[in-house]
């Protein structure tokens, strides 16, 4: 069942426009990096089974992120990228992103947000494999239905994992979160648009008295559809909502329709309809 039907009950076709908020943001983009206004956004992104946001990457600004964070030696993203194929189920896709979120500081341990679990989790990087087995692999009974038909002529190598008693420190994420893709060194379109959208979201949320965190996320795909925005509700029964082609004049409409009203705006929605 797709996310739109399962988690939200209503669609609205168009995003309300806030007059007087338009800015000529497209003129700041390079001529060889236009925004794709032709393609229907519905279905342009496969929503992952789980989305992990790495917060302990050590960067203060998104402009500092290298193009490929997963190649940064010694980083949690690199460690997980090396283990991913051996640990993660191909039937349960995991997206690993880096994010800059307000009021989250880096400590001695790795710190991540995990959705739709809606948990902030801390652990030592040496326990990364155990973390992945604990949080990023579905239960055995769920995996069983995806097992291939037995072939006696095919040699298989069993992947074993001995569970360790590790005390992963976790707590619920109590606030909604809005992230804007701002991975400048990956694509200049997101780098140019993100700071403007972040400021506009903060203003619109403040004007409505809403306590929602707003931050920046690394590459999530679809730079041609910038600005790319993900809304993570704090309600565990709701999945994240992915939008594309978000510009400043549409921010207030997203806050009113999606954050407050619980509606999906069809013209911006990158998930399956």
Curated annotation (Swiss-Prot):
Xref: CDD domains: TRX_Fd_Sucrase
InterPro entries (alphabetical): Aim32/Apd1-like, Thioredoxin-like_sf
Pfam families linked to this entry: Suc_Fer-like
PANTHER family assigned: ACTIN PATCHES DISTAL PROTEIN 1, ALTERED INHERITANCE OF MITOCHONDRIA PROTEIN 32
Annotated family: Belongs to the AIM32 family.
Record protein name field: Altered inheritance of mitochondria protein 32
Organism of provenance: Debaryomyces hansenii (strain ATCC 36239 / CBS 767 / BCRC 21394 / JCM 1990 / NBRC 0083 / IGC 2968) (Yeast)
């Amino acid at each position: 069942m797709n996310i739109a039907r399962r988690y939200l009950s209503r669609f609205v076709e168009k995003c309300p426009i806030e007059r007087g908020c338009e800015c000529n943001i497209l003129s700041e983009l390079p001529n060889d990096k236009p925004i794709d206004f032709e393609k229907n956004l519905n279905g342009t992104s496969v929503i992952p089974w789980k989305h992990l946001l790495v917060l302990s990457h050590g960067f203060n600004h998104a402009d500092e992120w290298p193009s490929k964070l997963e190649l940064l030696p010694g980083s949690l993203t690199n460690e997980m990228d090396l283990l991913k194929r051996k640990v993660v189920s191909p039937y349960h896709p995991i997206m690993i992103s880096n994010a800059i979120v307000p009021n989250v500081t880096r400590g001695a341990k790795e710190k991540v947000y995990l959705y739709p679990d809606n948990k902030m989790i801390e652990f030592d990087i040496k326990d990364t494999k155990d973390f992945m087995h604990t949080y990023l692999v579905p239960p055995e009974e769920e995996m069983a239905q995806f097992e291939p038909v037995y072939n006696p002529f095919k040699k298989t190598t069993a992947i074993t994992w001995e569970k360790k008693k590790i005390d992963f420190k976790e707590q619920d994420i109590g606030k909604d979160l809005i992230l804007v893709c701002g991975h400048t060194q990956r694509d200049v379109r997101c780098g140019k648009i993100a700071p403007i959208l972040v400021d506009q979201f903060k203003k619109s949320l403040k004007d409505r008295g809403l306590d929602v965190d707003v931050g920046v996320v690394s590459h999530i795909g679809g730079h041609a559809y910038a600005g790319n925005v993900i809304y993570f509700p704090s309600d565990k029964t709701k999945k994240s909502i992915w939008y594309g082609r978000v510009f400043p004049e549409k921010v207030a409409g997203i806050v009113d329709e999606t954050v407050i009203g619980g509606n999906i705006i069809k013209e911006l929605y990158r998930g399956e309809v």
